[in-house]
Amino acid sequence: MTMSENSRNLEAGLLLRKNQNDINECRITAVVLFSTFVSVCGSFCFGCAAGYSSVAQTGIINDLGLSVAQYSMFGSIMTFGGMIGAIFSGKVADLMGRKGTMWFAQIFCIFGWVAVALAKDSMWLDIGRLSTGFAVGLLSYVIPVYIAEITPKHVRGAFVFANQLMQSCGLSLFYVIGNFVHWRNLALIGLIPCALQVVTLFFIPESPRLLGKWGHEKECRASLQSLRGDDADISEEANTIKETMILFDEGPKSRVMDLFQRRYAPSVVIGVGLMLLQQLSGSSGLMYYVGSVFDKGGFPSSIGSMILAVIMIPKALLGLILVEKMGRRPLLLASTGGMCFFSLLLSFSFCFRSYGMLDELTPIFTCIGVVGFISSFAVGMGGLPWIIMSEIFPMNVKVSAGTLVTLANWSFGWIVAFAYNFMLEWNASGTFLIFFTICGAGIVFIYAMVPETKGRTLEDIQASLTDFLQ
């Protein structure tokens, strides 16, 4: 055999191995699909909880005689509970595991729905809502992290975006059935996805990256093998995880203050900045009190909620498709641009209405503005910050970073949700003008700071950001 023939055989062998690795990376197994479905049952719970306060407002106020301030507390206290959950989310997810954390969260979610369903006064309403908020605070961190850690890199964005899709499904479901079901029965319906996740969690594998971090190499490989398929060659991916964990183990243990080192600054600024933009754009307040916005704009809230329910799921599906085709960065820019435009439209609509101008058109403008804003949010800004958060932090600081980023999200979400009704009473047009300005600033921030992470391994993304300022 000649040297040239040996060379060709070697090249053919290397090409065959590369193609086999590519096939393994591209494979989407039934285990990955089922594991993702089980985890996003928690996202569905989140969506149901977020939509509940809007459709239940009239019934609860009439039955229990709550004031606007009392109901604002009930509506917003879920975000305060989420803030508490966020403080513990990273540590709990590392100590109990991703699966254990989801199971633990559902205990509080189930208690919360039962407390709301049986409440006789505002105190039990608030306790139940606070408990549900604590649960979704834990879930909002652990679900995208778990999905990012189990999925192949080429579909990671789409699978993590299923988190936002299922939130939209839960929100849409409650927007629809809330018009026909008593608020107590609606709370009991919220128990169904909680129970479904509790049962199905027993049948999915733990995150292989977390098992690797714990030093359970055998269990890590077994989990990875089940996720990639029995006949898949997982050696390269398993070795990458092992090498990364060894590198992190050799360094000092992570503390919150470590996040303020120069090497982690880009990741922290991007993660926290996107969460602040998501909340300060007014998205949470609008979804919690969308009925009030429709009524104030002269559009029937029951019809508006139904329109939203029909539109939100296709828009979230569109985002799931586009996240791997367009990439994270372009989709974020398009989504924030849409939110910016529709905030301005709502500002003009309420301004015209306050001066008695275009009385026949302002309700239509309000409907278009609300539906357009929430649709734009669902396509990108609703889910992408969580995707990027799950990608940009190395395992050695993921606990501290995840806690900080999730805490920032829920803290500002609580402020916006609590103040939203009061801001609308103060000046509806001015309120949406403020949100327009924030969305405009967000476009500049995304363009200047947020990198594209599509199609890259977690280790590659994290290394590039860590070395950015070195």
Swiss-Prot record:
Disruption phenotype: No effect on the root lengths compared to those of wild-type plant under high salinity conditions. Gene3D superfamilies: MFS general substrate transporter like domains (1.20.1250.20). Its main location: membrane. Keywords: Membrane, Stress response, Sugar transport, Transmembrane, Transmembrane helix, Transport, Vacuole. A motif (Essential for the localization to the vacuole membrane) lies at residues 10-16. InterPro entries: MFS_dom, MFS_ERD6/Tret1-like, MFS_sugar_transport-like, MFS_trans_sf, MFS_Trehalose_Transporter, Sugar/inositol_transpt, Sugar_transporter_CS. Induction: By drought and high salinity conditions, and with exogenous application of abscisic acid (ABA), with high expression after 5 hour exposure to these conditions. Expression in roots is higher than that in leaves upon the high salinity and ABA treatment likewise as it is under normal conditions. GO terms for cellular component: plant-type vacuole membrane; vesicle. Expressed in both shoots and roots. In roots, strongly expressed in pericycle and xylem parenchyma cells, and to a lesser extent in the root endodermis. In flowers, expressed in sepals. It comes from the Eukaryota. It is a multi-pass membrane protein. Changing L10A: Localizes mainly to the endoplasmic reticulum. GO terms for biological process: monosaccharide transmembrane transport; response to abscisic acid; response to salt stress; response to water deprivation. GO terms for molecular function: monosaccharide transmembrane transporter activity. It is found in: Vacuole membrane; Vesicle. SUPFAM superfamilies: MFS general substrate transporter (SSF103473). Belongs to the major facilitator superfamily. Sugar transporter (TC 2.A.1.1) family. The N-terminal sequence motif LXXXLL is necessary for localization to the vacuole membrane (tonoplast). Sugar transporter. Transports monosaccharides across the vacuolar membrane independently from a proton gradient. May function coordinately with the vacuolar invertase to regulate osmotic pressure by affecting the accumulation of sugar in the cells under abiotic stress conditions. PANTHER family: PTHR48021, SUGAR TRANSPORTER ESL1. This is Sugar transporter ESL1. It comes from Arabidopsis thaliana.
